[in-house]
């Protein structure tokens, strides 16, 4: 088969569905600019901005809906006006009242509040027809040696998620792991630990949300992490961004780790994974609409590059562990697609 024939076959594959976290269009603060980088926005404002992107189809929504007095009906109407759909809900059980943990809080009353908040978000998710409830237990972990009983933290986390999964068997729960921040060490800190926890839960409707940036600065190879989750049929969702591997910078896709991001999407495609390609970018100082368009343009180039990739040649190079040959094959496809994308 000629290379061009292979390209034509690959290019006929349907384009992915593109999504974003609604927080991509929010106003951000940090510990220095506590007054924020711009005017405050409600979730309705953010949804309207998302509609301006033009290539987004779905959104992941924080819940309770910021700033907290907005109804599900209002959000559903705002989504419909922008021709968008709710992909997921992300319950905010990582705020100040959960400073010592959500699922792992030493106070059983606060632990119950966290579980109940996630359950309430799942009910909202049902109303909106989401694909999954995203679980990001940002406050579940520890900060100092000797602070916590690690077995206790693990058990409380597993038990809470098992309870939720069994209470909502019709919904999927996607656990977004992260090595640290806001806690110095988090319970679900890697793909391996998260998969092991899911195994301990013994339920079918809990899986992994693989955030590319979390995987990077957690010392993983994101493509390898994706393969591990897919092999166990547990990769429920992805978030895509970039960073300098030292922190969760949430930069625009492909800004730093261009080749590794392409390898990540190749791993997904090669394994037949067909989920949403979702942005999780934090454009603190950039225009959020343009940042989303830039991220999608880059992801579209990655998708095009998958069609240009000579897979037989790549497989032969990988079988021989020919590092330079494999990189040359990947770069040839990627740089062609990027050049076409940036000149369009």
Annotate each predicted stretch with a short phrase.
Residues 1-120, 126, 203-205, 300-344:
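N-terminal pre-domain/capping segments
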Residues 2-12, 81, 85-86, 97-207, ...:
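Active-site acidic/histidine proton-transfer and metal-coordination neighborhood
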Residues 4-6, 44-51, 72-79, 118-122, ...:
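Generic structural signal for well-ordered alpha-helices
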Residues 16-22, 57-61, 86-91, 133-135, ...:
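Hydrophobic faces of well-ordered beta-strands that scaffold small-molecule active sites
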Residues 23-25, 62-66, 91-94, 138-140, ...:
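Active-site beta-loop-alpha junctions enriched in small/polar residues
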Residues 26-41, 105, 148, 184-195, ...:
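Gly/Pro-rich active-site loop or hairpin
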Residues 53-56, 128, 168, 271:
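Structural motif
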Residues 270-318:
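A contiguous, mid-protein "functional segment" used to position or interact
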